């Protein structure tokens, strides 16, 4: 279980195949017992700077694959991450409270989020007060997963300045291309998110899903609410052959989403049209959606 802590100017992590489900490992090499309940991350970078990971293949992780935590200046290049479609919590790459991250030329197909950007959960994230910011995701391919690019739901330190460009996505088991999720306990902000030049063959859910009332198991519920502000989202230059839905956006009544722009979409076939509510300033420009059923529900 590779864990790097407080490493700087780390040499390349060079090409190799890493698998985490080896059978019959000698007892002295086992990290967790067969009946243990804790599923370990595959690779964690904690408080690290200037790390370059290139050309590795990671398979069958029991939990998140690559987890940069409170780290900066990380490049992840030409990485392949594969986990079964039905394997829970096997996120591909999860930058958390990290900045200046580049993820490029990589292939991810997993049982949960392909890339999930986080910054801590509830009080832990607020006390840490370290956003994830300045993240570039470029020229990547996503297949199975709950989302291609996901922000949240653990974002209580904030997420800002994310650029996703020139990516390909295709699988009926990929449930969203871009997803943002939070709830009334997370707080903080999501702002300045751009996704552009995305090619999608088939996707099993909406191209964009934003949910500010995401219901997850909460252990820190209090009477005090912490609403998340979500501002300045641009999704442009989208080519798609089939999507289950164009977009599904549920903003918060208490703090509506502001400034969403969808521009230059060409979607050949969608099943359920579009739905959105609780948005201030939604701009649609040059949007072509060819729907089978009801086209729109706007509230």
Predicted feature locations:
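Extracellular/periplasmic carbohydrate-active domains that bind, remodel
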Residues: 1-299
């Amino acid at each position: 279980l590779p864990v790097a802590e407080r490493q700087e100017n780390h040499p390349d992590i060079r090409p190799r195949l890493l698998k985490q489900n080896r059978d019959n490992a000698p007892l002295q090499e086992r990290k967790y017992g067969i009946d243990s309940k804790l599923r370990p991350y595959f690779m964690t970078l904690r408080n690290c700077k200037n790390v370059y990971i290139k050309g590795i293949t990671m398979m069958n992780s029991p939990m998140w694959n690559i987890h940069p935590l409170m780290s900066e200046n990380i490049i992840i290049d030409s990485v392949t991450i594969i986990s079964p479609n039905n394997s829970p919590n096997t996120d591909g790459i999860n930058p958390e409270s990290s900045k200046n991250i580049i993820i490029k030329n990589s292939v991810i197909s997993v049982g949960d989020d392909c890339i999930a950007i986080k910054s801590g959960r509830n009080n832990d994230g607020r006390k840490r007060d370290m956003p994830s910011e300045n993240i570039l995701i470029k020229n990547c391919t996503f297949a199975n997963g709950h989302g291609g690019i996901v922000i949240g739901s653990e974002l209580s330190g904030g997420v800002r300045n994310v650029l996703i460009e020139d990516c390909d996505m295709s699988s009926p088991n990929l449930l969203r291309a871009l997803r943002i999720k939070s709830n009334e306990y997370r707080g903080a902000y999501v702002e300045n998110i751009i996704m552009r030049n995305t090619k999608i063959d088939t996707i099993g859910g909406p191209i964009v899903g934003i949910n500010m009332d995401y219901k997850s198991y909460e252990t820190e519920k209090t009477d005090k609410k912490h609403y998340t502000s979500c501002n300045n989202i641009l999704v442009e230059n989208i080519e798609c052959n089939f999507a289950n839905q164009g977009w599904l956006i549920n903003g918060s009544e208490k703090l509506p989403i502001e400034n969403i722009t969808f521009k230059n979409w060409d979607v050949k076939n969608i099943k359920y049209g579009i739905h959105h509510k609780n948005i201030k300033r939604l701009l649609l420009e040059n949007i072509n959606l060819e729907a089978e059923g009801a086209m729109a529900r706007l509230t």
